[in-house]
């Protein structure tokens, strides 16, 4: 894991999502990432309904820009907590099993 990228993800999370949950999952969280591995983030919003475009622009795109700065791919998936908790899926299973909450 690239510690510099991880620290900048933490800083960005505190700036744009101070009261929301962000979870790192995938190879970076498991500790088996290669130098070219992407960064998978789950963003859980404390609101009832998502506005896909607005939420992407506000909460996912800043992580895209951070990835560009470091020549890395950072994928932020945005859900409301309500939607995330109401739908079982393989993704949810993997996030719950291997995820690391970003403080």
What are these regions (language model features)?
Residues 1-21, 29-35, 46-103:
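Catalytic core of pol beta-like nucleotidyltransferases
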């Amino acid at each position: 894991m690239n510690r510099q990228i991880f620290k900048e993800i933490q800083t960005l999370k505190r700036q744009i999502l101070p009261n929301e949950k962000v979870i790192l999952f995938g190879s970076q969280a498991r500790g088996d990432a290669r130098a070219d591995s992407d960064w998978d983030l789950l963003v859980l919003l404390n609101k009832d309904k998502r506005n896909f475009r607005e939420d992407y622009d506000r909460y996912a795109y800043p992580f895209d820009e951070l990835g560009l700065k470091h020549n890395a791919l950072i994928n932020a998936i945005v859900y409301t907590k309500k939607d995330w908790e109401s739908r079982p899926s393989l993704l949810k299973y993997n996030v719950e099993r291997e995820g690391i909450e970003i403080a």
